[in-house]
């Protein structure tokens, strides 16, 4: 597995070629204003990364708000370009990561807790509360941390069912079951 970080820049900040007037607006992200409405019915991530907020180019930082309705999960995933620092602002969350020796480090977070997920390691968050939502804010040590969702990576990319069945020591019928739920909707 290759792990990389953002390169250092030689200027205070990087202005995209299509931006001619640099003022406070360039350094302001307004995409999280929508969070002030109702709560979503499915797990939702609102990101402020390089794609959404070009001022982050070269700054080695990004941000995400994670909204967990009752009983929802952010499935096992990795961020190959950054570590993650998660701050819980509402509810409770089960969180954890698995290191390169296959050891699970997990914790039940309460409001105000901060948890660190090391760069490139598989991790998850789960709101096991059946009544109340949870909200967390994550920061990343990269303007473009990228996310690799393991369920999608394994079951929607065309990896041969025989390879998956042998890898999971199961049969092809068992491998096909999660593919149905993960298939893109028309």
Predicted features along the sequence, with ranges:
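Beta-strand elements of modular eukaryotic interaction domains
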Residues: 52-55, 75-77, 113-114, 126-127
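Short acidic-glycine-tyrosine-enriched beta hairpin
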Residues: 56-58, 99-120
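Glycine- and acidic-residue-biased ligand/ion/polar-headgroup-sensing regions
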Residues: 69-73, 79-101, 111
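Structural recognition of the beta-strand scaffold that forms the well-ordered cores
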Residues: 64-67, 85-88, 94-96, 115-117, ...
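Conserved beta-strand elements of beta-rich interaction domains across eukaryotes
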Residues: 1, 70-73, 92-93, 114, ...
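Extracellular/periplasmic catalytic domains that process cell-envelope and extracellular macromolecules
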Residues: 58, 78-80, 86-88, 116, ...
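A short, N-terminal "cap"/entry segment at the start of jelly-roll beta-barrel domains
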Residues: 1-64, 168, 174-186
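Double-stranded beta-helix
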Residues: 11-12, 103, 107, 116, ...
């Amino acid at each position: 597995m290759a792990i990389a970080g953002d390169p250092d820049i030689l200027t205070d900040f990087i202005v995209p070629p299509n931006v001619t007037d640099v003022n406070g607006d360039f350094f302001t992200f307004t995409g999280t204003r929508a969070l002030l409405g109702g709560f979503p019915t499915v797990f939702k991530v609102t990101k402020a990364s390089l794609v959404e907020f070009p001022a982050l180019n070269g700054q080695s930082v990004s941000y995400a708000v994670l909204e967990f309705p009752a009983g929802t999960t952010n499935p096992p995933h990795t961020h190959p370009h950054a570590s993650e620092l998660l701050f819980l602002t509402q509810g409770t969350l089960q969180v954890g990561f698995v290191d390169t020796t296959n050891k699970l480090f997990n914790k039940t977070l309460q409001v105000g807790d901060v948890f660190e997920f090391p760069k490139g390691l598989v991790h998850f968050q789960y709101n096991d509360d059946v009544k109340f939502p949870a909200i967390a804010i994550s920061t990343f040590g990269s303007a473009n941390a990228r996310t690799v969702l393991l369920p999608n990576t394994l079951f929607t990319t065309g990896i041969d069912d025989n390879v998956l069945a042998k890898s999971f020591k199961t049969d092809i019928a068992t491998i096909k079951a999660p593919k149905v739920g993960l298939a893109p909707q028309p």
